[in-house]
């Protein structure tokens, strides 16, 4: 089924593009959610009239993405995590954790735009994480996972002696 996109979609197309998608994807997701319209003569004429505004909007998004990339390339995140004696983390780091930390720094990034090359981060170390900002514009941030220092308990162990 041919549809015209009303929004940019990663791996599908940009706003105003006419794309071929499976019928079920169009009927069950794109059309009901308002992300696309049927590709017919009337809708094509409407989008041709809006083409200049769409291109201007895309240029604005690209400019904003480049500015955001310059800021994000300087960012490094640090997570202090607990682990077992073998060095395996009790809780892995995923895109939601990274998005929350970026939000604390003032960057509102959707978690689906964060690409952790390893799926989730489960061991200590420094990792490069890619953030997809716009078509062809990606920022790379450093994520460091450090070990939380274990607190040594100062309690004296009591020994219980039983007489037999």
UniProtKB/Swiss-Prot annotation:
Q: Name one GO biological process term.
A: translation
The protein's matches in InterPro entries, at most eight in alphabetical order, are given as: Ribosomal_bL9, Ribosomal_bL9/RNase_H1_N, Ribosomal_bL9_bac/chp, Ribosomal_bL9_C, Ribosomal_bL9_C_sf, Ribosomal_bL9_N, Ribosomal_bL9_N_sf
Q: Tell me one GO molecular function of this protein.
A: rRNA binding
Keyword Ribonucleoprotein assigned:
yes
Domain of life, per the record? Bacteria
UniProt-listed PROSITE patterns: RIBOSOMAL_L9 (PS00651)
Q: Name one GO cellular component term.
A: ribosome
| Record-linked Gene3D superfamilies | Ribosomal protein L9, C-terminal domain, Ribosomal protein L9, N-terminal domain
Keyword field: Ribonucleoprotein, Ribosomal protein, RNA-binding, rRNA-binding
Query: Matching SUPFAM superfamilies, A to Z?
Result: L9 N-domain-like (SSF55658), Ribosomal protein L9 C-domain (SSF55653)
**Short name of any one Pfam family annotated for the protein:** Ribosomal_L9_C
| PANTHER family found in the cross-reference section | 50S RIBOSOMAL PROTEIN L9 (PTHR21368)
Q: What does this protein do?
A: Binds to the 23S rRNA.
User: What family does the entry list?
Assistant: Belongs to the bacterial ribosomal protein bL9 family.
Question: Under which name does UniProt file this protein?
Answer: Large ribosomal subunit protein bL9
User: From what organism does this protein derive?
Assistant: Borrelia hermsii (strain HS1 / DAH)
